[in-house]
Amino acid sequence: MLTTGHLDAVDFWSWYARWWPMLLIGLGGLLLLEHFMDAGSPWVGRRPMGGIVWLVILMIALGAVAREGHLVGPFAWNFGDHNNDDFWSWMGPEHDNDVQIDQALSSAKPSITVNVPRGDVTITPSTDGQMHIRAHQMVHRSSDNEARQLFEELKPKVETSSNGAVVTVPDKEATRVDLTMEVPAAAYATITAQHGDVTADGLTGGIQVTDDHGDVKLEDMAADAHARMNHGDFSAHNMQGKVLVDGTGDDVTISEVKGEARVDGEFFGDIHLEQVSGTVHYHSSMTDLEIPHLVGSLTLDKSDLSISRAAGPVRVIAKSKDIDMSQIAGDAHIEDSNGDVTVATASPLGNVEIADHTGDVVLTMPEDASFSVTGNASGDEDIRTDFPLHMTNNDGRQTLDGAVGHGGVRLHLEAEHGNLELRKGSSATLSMNESGDNGETAKHFKAPAGAKPTVEQQ
């Protein structure tokens, strides 16, 4: 009946996804009833149960597959994050349709709200100060009549007011609608997407995005941006306001931000930030850091943290990370529990505190620097220094203390289970020129989409 079209496949699998546990209960009830009815019959032998067991396993497997496809967005393999259109093609051929909507707006700085259950959203500024929507509809149905009916039901609904407009795409199973929108540049956009990518470029009024399954890409924005992620990558480039990202996801790439950059949540891919004029905040279950001014770049993955050219006071608290920091000016407070810590300072110098529970600590100071230092490591590890300082070994602990030059800044170094090393380095001054002295970026930095490659990358 499914293959002949007498029973709608979408309706059947939606029903089965919801009610398959009741079928199992019903099957169990029938078997129990049969057992009691045959209990008084001595000639009834033991029936083989292999077929029943395999039937139960098949029902559970089909129920799990149907329910997963129903919960993550009906038939998400067909209209999911990677646009795999083949899995559910047996439901019927793909039908496509385009809808154009032009809407006048009374406000010069409207509030635009967009709700899309499945599909991508792309927003750019309009040239006439009005709103223009192009909706590309995609459905899998066995007949043209069904597809035409769905196209009409899927037409975006636009509700206008004196403050702006609300654009809503109806939620229909096994469908997808991609929106390409042009809105007034000064509009404040609020976008909610359940399954699909969100791209915004050139807005000056600000944007807030909530995306459950999909990537978010923002570029050339002249106001604040806030994204709530669940699954997917986030990128923002050339942002004049704040950039705030929270939730869970994969890669995060943020570059050329004039305001604050804040990442709060569990992101399991690579984290890349570069040239942030405001304060950088990052918080997860494994890493907590704050950098008042990131002149260079920051790279973070599951095992490494690299920071290049940053102005303090820098604060880093990490677990199970190898930390590599270069050209760090001002105060720095660093804690690590399972990994090596390597820091090279730059002028203007500040107080430096490093505590590492398990791992080596290496600090490089300019050879002409003035500072006082206290440091300690366990007795079975090594302490090495290029400076004329006092070292002792008492009660299973090695210590390092003394002053260089006229004292100056204070250093406090602890390596609970690891080597401690204080090195001489060349003098360096942190330039606040965001283009950098040599054009280099931190290792592993992934340039934002659309950025021109360097000579080395070419």
Language-model region placement:
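Alpha-helical transmembrane segments and their membrane-interface anchoring/capping motifs
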Residues: M1-H140, D171-D178, E182, A186-Y188, ...
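Short, surface-exposed interaction patches in beta-rich subdomains
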Residues: N97, I101, L150, P170-K172, ...
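Extracytosolic and intramembrane catalytic regions of membrane-associated proteins
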Residues: T122-T124, D128-S161, A165-V166
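Envelope-exposed proteins and targeting segments
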Residues: I101, A108-I112, P117, T127-I133, ...
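Right-handed parallel beta-helix
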Residues: A189-T248, T253
